[in-house]
Each structure stands twice: as C-alpha cells, then as structure tokens.
C-alpha cells in the first residue's frame, strides 16, 4: 500500500479516526512524498530530505491513533516510541540512538518472516522428505547421505528399490492425508538457543551494537536437541528449520538496512515530556540533553547497529505532544527547526464524541455489543442514548481534566458495569439502552463533581 495517493490515505484514516483533517492531510502528504522521492533521478534523490512533522493537541484527540493506523497502512519500516523513555548520554536509561537500532531490528524481523513465507512451500517439501527418511530409512543402513542418523520409530526396510519407492509414496500419501497424525517420531533438531549471559546490563548490550550470538557462534559447539513428537508437530518443526536454512540472512539484513535508510518512519510520542519546564539544575537539565542528543539523529547522522552502519538522513520523524504544561516554542530552537511542519489538532466536543461512538470501523459501541453477544445478550443503543453519553463525556471533560476520547471508555465501563457482570445469567435476553437508562446510571457523576474527578 506504499503507492496510495494522499486522498486514499486520508480515506483509510477516516475509517478509524474522526475529524482532524489537517493532521491527516499532513501525514498523507509526507507518506506520498516518500514514494515521490523514489521516482526522481538518483542524483536529485539524495538532496530531497523528509519534512518532519510535529502534531500538537490535547490528550485523547487522535495523535497516537494516527500513528497506529499509519503503521498498518504503510509497508515502510515504522517504529512508535515514547520520547520520555530516553535519557541523556551518561544517565541511566536508553539513549536516543536506540530507536534507530530498534527500527532496524524490527525491519530485519519482518523481512525474515516474509522471506520465510516465500520459501515455505519448498521448506514443506524438504520437511516431508526428512519425515519420510525417519519413517523409512534408506536401505544402505542407519546413516543418511548427509551423515545424520534417522532416529525413531520407522517402517521395516524394504530392500527392493521399486518396492521401497512404492512404500515411500504410500507413506507420503498417508502423511498428506493426515493418517499418520497419531504416530510418534524421534527427531534431532539444531539447538538455536543461546546461553543466558548478562554482562553490563545497566548500559545495555544493544547500546554497544554488539551481536554476542554471532561472536560466540564459532566458539560454541553446534548442539542438536533430540525430541519425540507426533508427526504433525514434527512436520511443522522441520518446516521451520528448513525455511530458516533457505533464507539468506545476509541478504535480509542488507535489504532491511536499505529500507530503513530510504523509507523508515519513526513516530516520537510525548515529545513534550522532554521539554524543560523550569530553568535551573535538576532533572530538566537531562531533558534538554535528550533534545540535543536528538538533533543529529533527526538532522541526519550515522548510527552503529549490530547489523552495520545506518544513515538517518532520509528517515521521516513524526513527533506528537499535548504541550499542556509547556509550549512547542519551549523546545530548543535547533530542534524546532528540524520539525518544519506543525499541525494543531482540534479539541473534541460532544458531536465528535457521538461520531466516535458509532462511525469508525469497530467503533466503541459495536465492541461492547459484540462482547455481550458472546454471552447471548443482545444490546441495542438508542440514538438519544448515544448522544447523552457524548454530552456527558464533554461535560465531565470540561469539569475535570480534559482527556478527550479516552473519557468515553471509562464512561462506557461505568454505564455497562452491572450488565457486564450479570451477562452470564442473562443469556437469551434483549436489553434496550435509552436516554433514561444512561441518565440514571450516570446521574451520580453529573451531580457530584468530586466523584466525577475519580472517573478517569
């Protein structure tokens, strides 16, 4: 889906996120520009840098949801991480370069899975042959051509070549038909596990870009693990092993690094949490240090990973923050300049809450309806009941902390608490939820401001 037009991207986001048209347009253009850059001549391609985006808006308006949906929408390497996890170099915690390492590791894993799926058909055929070798050893004796011993319960050896081939084909037919599912076989599988070693755990081995598995691969003996399992499980295990052997990991790593460098996207959530809220010494100094550590990564630098050097020049960074205790201008000026596109997301009111409850795919009301249906309880919400829930969410947000659409989750739990508890005893019943039901269940919150503060 990497060649979606901006309009198509917005349509996809509209299925899950209500409103926020400006934010959707900005991320849609940024995604499309990734595709456009790949189409220009190579000499110009290196000069086109991504325009990083910062999404500004109160909590619960859809910033993080946009990131979640983008991750599913694009086939580009995508990582969402909270900026508050990072600490300045020299402090206990993770340094900012670890997000690039995480993105590379994630991409390698995804590519490895897709490559294994591509060779799965061949791996299944090879696994079948290995199972048949176990069930029907070769007439030369117990030694296989590759030197491994075929272990386990097996069929009596047939000396005649034609008879042996015929027996092998009969076994293959039975194997594919599932007639051998209750037979046990003994297997020898490569033991790919590594001994648990914890060295310098506070600094984190991944921070050094060291792959201890590769370092010890030539030193540790290649052990084999012997297991007795049923034929279907044996076939699955052998298929995984054969697929692993068929995948060229050097090629996968090269593809992953190139993909990260050319089309990687990092979503930095809660970037406002690394803004210094006051002048002076203390933890805020470390926060400013994190911002300064971010500068070279966002602008473009080389990060060492266990898979090699990775350039960040063309990685797209999308940051988001509520900025309710600070302003975007409180970021250090150098970092502000690295995010040229700023989008302010709108606060949500009762009309948006009403749409959130019913419009998106797998909307919140539909989730509760389906959950209760599993117990045999058929729930129906009247239109005025939904509007009352939306109005209540707006009212509680205005009277306490404004947490946006997240208020709907807590109100729905409070509204349906008794029904969710008693559902197993009400199988086969129908429940109609109207405005009076909503008003009655939520009247204590509306009438008691102190209580409403606890409805987070």
From Swiss-Prot:
It comes from the Bacteria. InterPro entries: AAA+_ATPase, ATP-dep_Clp_protease_ClpX, ATPase_AAA_core, Clp_ATPase_C, HslU, P-loop_NTPase. One of its GO terms (biological process) is proteolysis involved in protein catabolic process. CDD domains: RecA-like_HslU (cd19498). One of its GO terms (molecular function) is peptidase activity. ATP binds at residues 18, 60-65, 269, 334, 406. SMART domains: AAA (SM00382), ClpB_D2-small (SM01086). One of its GO terms (cellular component) is HslUV protease complex. Keywords: ATP-binding, Chaperone, Cytoplasm, Nucleotide-binding, Stress response. ATPase subunit of a proteasome-like degradation complex; this subunit has chaperone activity. The binding of ATP and its subsequent hydrolysis by HslU are essential for unfolding of protein substrates subsequently hydrolyzed by HslV. HslU recognizes the N-terminal part of its protein substrates and unfolds these before they are guided to HslV for hydrolysis. A double ring-shaped homohexamer of HslV is capped on each side by a ring-shaped HslU homohexamer. The assembly of the HslU/HslV complex is dependent on binding of ATP. Belongs to the ClpX chaperone family. HslU subfamily. NCBIfam families: hslU (TIGR00390), PRK05201.1 (NF003544). This is ATP-dependent protease ATPase subunit HslU. The lineage of its organism: Bacteria, Pseudomonadati, Thermodesulfobacteriota, Desulfobacteria, Desulfobacterales.
